[in-house]
């Protein structure tokens, strides 16, 4: 059994770690609320854009934009949203597992995959396991802006425009609630038809001013950018929620460990006192 002094040192070490994890839990809770506000503010715009694009995908358009046309799939692209920091439980690895499974399904069909990575954890992971990373952006912090994402989005859209990609997806964690975040893979291009059953039975027609091509070029790019940005802010809220839960679990585990060490410490002290009493009694008997 370890000595009482050594056990006291371990207890002090765990208590110090517990203070750190408790502080990180409180910081994550504060950041999560701010991230949720940002997510809620951007969601109406993203949802409205998705609805309008759903109308376009099911409408009778006078100009058929390339983003609306299905192609033979030879190469797919993924805009992957990961975190820049760790200590957020299985948030990243669960997302990567889902992505790898989807990539394998395409690979089994002879389709190649390109990745545009957002977040340093994703870059590190796919550099180690192997993956064709064609663009990346890291270090966006806790207040990302659309301008931070233009680089990877532009690279993937240019590849799609030039016919080097036939499908484009955004991969991120969807914030459900504080305790639950779901990894999702959402198709961006070609534009998926609306999933609203009511819209499927309607015929949509639009009048464009001044020019359908110029308008759709701008609108559809804004749509892709809005969906990627929404994925980033949802992933950020998911990250802070997962980190808060992970740090709370670490703090609680620290408390349990301290109780166990305190019990061991008490037993060690009891054994030490018993040994001292035995030595005193033995010495007295010898005299």
Swiss-Prot record:
Any one Pfam family match given in the protein's UniProt record, by short name: ATP-synt
NCBIfam families with a match to the protein in the record: ATPsyn_F1gamma, PRK05621.1-1
Location of this chain's protein in the cell: Cell inner membrane
Single Gene Ontology MF annotation: ATP binding
Record's subunit section: F-type ATPases have 2 components, CF(1) - the catalytic core - and CF(0) - the membrane proton channel. CF(1) has five subunits: alpha(3), beta(3), gamma(1), delta(1), epsilon(1). CF(0) has three main subunits: a, b and c.
Superkingdom, natural source: Bacteria
Membrane topology: Peripheral membrane protein
GO biological process assignments: proton motive force-driven plasma membrane ATP synthesis
KW Cell membrane (keyword) present: yes
Name of the protein described by the UniProt record: ATP synthase gamma chain
Recorded family membership: Belongs to the ATPase gamma chain family.
Biological role stated in the UniProt entry: Produces ATP from ADP in the presence of a proton gradient across the membrane. The gamma chain is believed to be important in regulating ATPase activity and the flow of protons through the CF(0) complex.
Keywords: ATP synthesis, Cell inner membrane, Cell membrane, CF(1), Hydrogen ion transport, Ion transport, Membrane, Transport
GO cellular component: plasma membrane; proton-transporting ATP synthase complex
Lineage: Bacteria, Pseudomonadati, Pseudomonadota, Gammaproteobacteria, Enterobacterales
Database matches in InterPro entries: ATP_synth_F1_ATPase_gsu, ATP_synth_F1_gsu, ATP_synth_F1_gsu_CS
Gene3D superfamilies, alphabetized: 3.40.1380.10, ATP synthase, gamma subunit, helix hairpin domain
